Every structure is written in structure tokens, then in C-alpha cells.
């Protein structure tokens, strides 16, 4: 379900402050965030965020194509190892 247009995009308040501090300092450092639910805004383009996936922070470099998506989309929480191989088929 899509968020109402009149509400605008959701971004945690502390996130805007962190992004402004890094941009003002001029250093290209990873901004650690836990807010996977926040929307990526145009002012985040060019910055690198460490998005928490429940285990560690995954570095996500924000590009133009990511604007409007959520941070959680770019840091998977589950590791897929594939389906188990068929042992009977290998013996033949």
C-alpha cells in the first residue's frame, strides 16, 4: 500500500541532522543508521549510509535511482544459501 501524497515521505528526524553534519564537514564517512523504514531523499545522494540488517551495518552508497525507495530495500536481512542438493541424483 502506498503512502498518501499529502503526508509526504517519512524520514526519521535524526537522520536529516546526521546527513547535514557529514555534508558540512566534507568528509566521506559512513553514517550508521538503524532506520530501515526511512525514505531516501534527494539530499542524501552521494552519501554512504550503514544500514543495520539485524546483525551488522551494510554500507549503502545512495545514487539518483534510489531516491523514493526505503533504506531497508538495500540491506537484506536474510541470507539465502540455496535449496539443498538432491543426494540421490549425485550418486548416479
From Swiss-Prot:
Top-rank taxon of the source lineage equals Bacteria
Q: Which GO terms describe its molecular function?
A: rRNA binding; structural constituent of ribosome
Among InterPro entries, the record links this protein to:
Ribosomal_uS19 (IPR002222), Ribosomal_uS19_bac-type (IPR005732), Ribosomal_uS19_CS (IPR020934), Ribosomal_uS19_SF (IPR023575)
Q: Mind telling me which SUPFAM superfamilies this protein's record contains?
A: Ribosomal protein S19
What GO cellular component entries does it have? cytoplasm; small ribosomal subunit
Q: Does the keyword Ribosomal protein apply?
A: yes
Q: Which UniProt keywords apply?
A: Ribonucleoprotein, Ribosomal protein, RNA-binding, rRNA-binding
Q: What is one Gene Ontology biological process annotated in the Swiss-Prot or TrEMBL record?
A: translation
Instruction: Name the job this protein performs.
Output: Protein S19 forms a complex with S13 that binds strongly to the 16S ribosomal RNA.
Q: Which family does the UniProt entry place this protein in?
A: Belongs to the universal ribosomal protein uS19 family.
What is the name attached to this protein's record? Small ribosomal subunit protein uS19
Q: Which organism is it from?
A: Bartonella tribocorum (strain CIP 105476 / IBS 506)
- Tell me the classification of the organism that encodes this protein: Bacteria, Pseudomonadati, Pseudomonadota, Alphaproteobacteria, Hyphomicrobiales
Amino acid at each position: 500500500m502506498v503512502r498518501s501524497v499529502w503526508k509526504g515521505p517519512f524520514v526519521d528526524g535524526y537522520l536529516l541532522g546526521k546527513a547535514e553534519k557529514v555534508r558540512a564537514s566534507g568528509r566521506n564517512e559512513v553514517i550508521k543508521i538503524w532506520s530501515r523504514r526511512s525514505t531516501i531523499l534527494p539530499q542524501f545522494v552521494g552519501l554512504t549510509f550503514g544500514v543495520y540488517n539485524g546483525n551488522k551495518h551494510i554500507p549503502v552508497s545512495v545514487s539518483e535511482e534510489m531516491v523514493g525507495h526505503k533504506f531497508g530495500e538495500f540491506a537484506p536481512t536474510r541470507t539465502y544459501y540455496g535449496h539443498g542438493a538432491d543426494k540421490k541424483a549425485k550418486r548416479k
